[in-house]
Each structure stands twice: as structure tokens, then as C-alpha cells.
């Protein structure tokens, strides 16, 4: 009888320990949730900087035919508090790695258009570089033309038009900050065009302890013209219902390989979802669907603690029964 009372007492103690662990776990979870969801302080609007540039549009896709001359325009807005002068000029546009770090100096067969661009100055003349002025809160329209020669390569042509503010005080002995924005010019010539895409990889993890859920892939362009690789991302609950859906396009330039990534920015701290990721590039397509688990580290620690307590309880129970059997044999 005493042994039974002792066993029941130990069992109750173990139950109290489990309840205490669960209570502490809940308190810790609420504390973490409160930290993650606490609203950021609101600050008053910052004072306008003296010099600030805004351009529109930021990209121009054009058709380039032999011996043609075409004019285009873009706007430069002074959103700062003071007037300033700025200059415009064109540079080659290319990339130097699979992460698509841009290069504005490397020249190749697909950057010749940067030499075909000239700008109309205030006197009506065209030149490789032009300077203008714009007052605070005002807009300046810039006109440029592309003069296409008779002998042009087939496929795509890429350049960037820079708008660079000219500081009023040029202190050569100090640090000079330059404000510069760019407008991408993507051209397609009327020569022979070859389009070729290859999806080299398409991956998505199934388990996350922190961070944002993402899917990534690698696309190769073996042609002579750019194309748009489309990433699609669909997140569903296990028992149905779409939680999140997104689609994004990525330019892939000729003779390059690009690593691309799509991220679920509002990934929750905990959950289990069915996620479908699809990558399309010209006539190539890959799709994968996975069950993805998101579980933070502190919850893993709690589960391990509960598992340890459960195992300890079974060990105590097993030893108790073994001891009882031994006494009965004696």
C-alpha cells in the first residue's frame, strides 16, 4: 500500500513538473510574440534634403532598325529643397556574375547601343553628354535620340542613361557625394535573333527554424537576346486555402547565367504549409510542390524538454514495476 502511495506521489510530482514546463513555455512564447509584433515608434517626417533626384520612366525597351533615328524623352524631377544642375550620359550595361552585379564599363557586342545615344541640350544640339538645370519642385524633360548604323549585330542591345547631379560646392580636399540615377535602355535589333533558355536548377527547402521561406533557381541564356524568366510562388494551408501567392519576372541577358530568388516576406514564425514553386523561361518550365515546416528554435527546445521528461517518466515507471516483480518473486 505504501509503495502504491509513493508511486502516485511521484507521478503527481512529474505531472506538476510537466505543467510548470508548459507554463514557462507559454510565457516565453507570448514574450517572443510580443517582441516580434511590437509596433515600431513613429517619427516625424524628415526634412527634405537639399539635393534629391527622381526620374521617370526608369526603363525604355526599343526596337532598333538599321539606319533609323528615333527620339525619346524622360523626366527628371527635383524633389529636394534646392535647385541644382545635372548632366546626362550613356554607358554600357552588362552583368559580371550569376548574382547579376551590374557593370557600366564592360563593353561587348551587346552594348554598342551606348555609343548610338546622344542628348539634346538647351541650344537644340545633340552630344554624347549634356548639362541642364532644374529648380526645387520642378521637372525637366530630357530628349535623347538613338542613331542606328547600317551594320548592326542581331539580338539585344543594352545601355544605361545616367542622370548625375552636379554639386554646387566642389571641395577637392573633402569627401564628395554624388547623386546618380539610371534609366536602362533595352533594344532589340531587326537582325537575326536567337532565343535559348535552360533551367539549370530549381530548389526549395522543406524545413525552417527561422527566416523567410524562399525558392531559388538558376537560368542560363545561350541566345543573343534577353528574355524574362517568371517565378511563381503559391502557399496553401495543409487542409486547403491559399495563404500567399506571388509572381515575379527576372531579365536574363544573352550569354549569361542568372541566380534568381523569390521570397515570402511575411513568413510566420510557426506553421506547416503546402508550397508550390514554378519557374518558367521561354519554352522551359519546372515545378515542385513540398510540405514546408516552420518551427522556431525555442519550440524545438521545449519539445526536447517534454520528450526528455516523458522518457524519464517511462524509465521511472519501468523500474518501479521491475522492483515490484522482484519483491513478488522473493
Which residues does each PLM region occupy?
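Short Pro-Gly-centered flexible turn/kink motifs
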Residues: 67-72, 132-145, 253-263
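Short, solvent-exposed loop/turn segments enriched in Ser/Thr/Gly
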Residues: 56, 67-73, 140-142, 154-160, ...
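Terminal connector regions
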Residues: 82-113, 141, 147-192, 266-300
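Beta-strand-rich interaction surfaces with strong enrichment in secreted/lumenal proteins
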Residues: 60-63, 128-134, 148, 247-252, ...
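N-terminal edge beta-strand
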Residues: 47-71, 200, 204-209
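Surface-exposed binding patches on compact interaction domains or structured appendages
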Residues: 50-57, 82-144, 230-231, 237-240
Amino acid at each position: 500500500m505504501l509503495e502504491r502511495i509513493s508511486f502516485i506521489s511521484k507521478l503527481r510530482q512529474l505531472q506538476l513538473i510537466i505543467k510548470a514546463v508548459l507554463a514557462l513555455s507559454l510565457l516565453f512564447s507570448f514574450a517572443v510574440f510580443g517582441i516580434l509584433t511590437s509596433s515600431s515608434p513613429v517619427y516625424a517626417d524628415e526634412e527634405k534634403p537639399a539635393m534629391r533626384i527622381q526620374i521617370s520612366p526608369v526603363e525604355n525597351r526599343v526596337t532598333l532598325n538599321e539606319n533609323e533615328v528615333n527620339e525619346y524623352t524622360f523626366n527628371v524631377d527635383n524633389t529636394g529643397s534646392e535647385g541644382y544642375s545635372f548632366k546626362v550620359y550613356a554607358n554600357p550595361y552588362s552583368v559580371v556574375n550569376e548574382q547579376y552585379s551590374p557593370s557600366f564599363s564592360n563593353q561587348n557586342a551587346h552594348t554598342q547601343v551606348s555609343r548610338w545615344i546622344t542628348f539634346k541640350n538647351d541650344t537644340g544640339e545633340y552630344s554624347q553628354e549634356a548639362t541642364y538645370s532644374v529648380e526645387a519642385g520642378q521637372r525637366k524633360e530630357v530628349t535623347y535620340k538613338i542613331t542606328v548604323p547600317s551594320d548592326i549585330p542581331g539580338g539585344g542591345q543594352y545601355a544605361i542613361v545616367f542622370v548625375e547631379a552636379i554639386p554646387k560646392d566642389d571641395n577637392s580636399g573633402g569627401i564628395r557625394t554624388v547623386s546618380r540615377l539610371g534609366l536602362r535602355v533595352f533594344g532589340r535589333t531587326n537582325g537575326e535573333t536567337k532565343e535559348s533558355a535552360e533551367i539549370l536548377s530549381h530548389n526549395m527547402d522543406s524545413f525552417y527554424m527561422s527566416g523567410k521561406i524562399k525558392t531559388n533557381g538558376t537560368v542560363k541564356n545561350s541566345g543573343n537576346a534577353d528574355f524574362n524568366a517568371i517565378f511563381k510562388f503559391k502557399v496553401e494551408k495543409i487542409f486547403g486555402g491559399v495563404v500567399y501567392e506571388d509572381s515575379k519576372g527576372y531579365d536574363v541577358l544573352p550569354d549569361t547565367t542568372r541566380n534568381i530568388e523569390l521570397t515570402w516576406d511575411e513568413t510566420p514564425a510557426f506553421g506547416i504549409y503546402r508550397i508550390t514553386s514554378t519557374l518558367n523561361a521561354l519554352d522551359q518550365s519546372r515545378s515542385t510542390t513540398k510540405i514546408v515546416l516552420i518551427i522556431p528554435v525555442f519550440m524545438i527546445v521545449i519539445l526536447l524538454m517534454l520528450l526528455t521528461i516523458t522518457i524519464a517518466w517511462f524509465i521511472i515507471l519501468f523500474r518501479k514495476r521491475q522492483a515490484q516483480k522482484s519483491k513478488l518473486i522473493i
